[in-house]
Amino acid sequence: MILRMLEEERGPQSTWAVGPLYRSRFPSTSLNRWMPQISNVISNDLTPTWEVTPSVSRQMSFSFIVRDNGSGFANGIGQTSTDLMDISVEDSDPFVILTPNTDVIWNVGSTEMISWDVGQTDNTTINCQTVNIKLSTDGGMTYPILLSSNTPNDGSEAIMIPNILTTSARVMVEAADTIETALDISCSSSANLILDDFRRL
């Protein structure tokens, strides 16, 4: 009993080959579920106490549950639906953005280079052949702006800075042709980017 209590307080470990690594969360209006939470991802913390990205090869099984509260049924009897998904995790080199990796100012209309370490994501097991490059203007919480679509997963891409001014931009590279984007293969820059108009500098 004492050992179990200590284990529960410690939380899951990235080296676990079996057992749960992520927790259930309350319903949300968001169409995306970040694992771990997006606030952890953008601070480069993929192993917070209760949601841990695995560092070893393993299988993970997920259950997505939708439940209504029965408001449209007699006596308030609700309905549920479940979708199951299994994911294979590869113990391989990380998929990470290399540049930008420091705070920098980019001018609207300029062409900038994004580079990333492909790791082993382009091998036959993971088979990520193309990526999307997206831009966040709110510090990495959302990535609504598509800078490049279905570009080869070759580690670099020149992108044009859109006509948007912000002091808290981030860049994300995500797989375009597999499920992977930290649980999906995705990586966001750790740098804080400032998008400015050179005419104002």
Enumerate the language-model features and the residues they cover.
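Exoplasmic/lumenal beta-rich domain surfaces
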Residues: 1-57, 125-158
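Short, aromatic- and glycine-rich surface loops/edge beta-strands on solvent-exposed regions
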Residues: 62-66, 167-177
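Short, solvent-exposed loop/turn segments at the edges of extracellular beta-sandwich modules
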Residues: 67-78, 176-180
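C-terminal edge beta-strand
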Residues: 73-93, 186-191
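Proline-enriched interdomain boundary motifs that mark the N-terminal boundary
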Residues: 93-100, 195-200
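Short, solvent-exposed loop/linker segments at the N-terminal edge
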Residues: 103-110
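A short beta-strand segment in extracellular, disulfide-stabilized domains
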Residues: 111-115
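Short amphipathic, basic-aromatic surface patches that mediate peripheral association
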Residues: 117-123
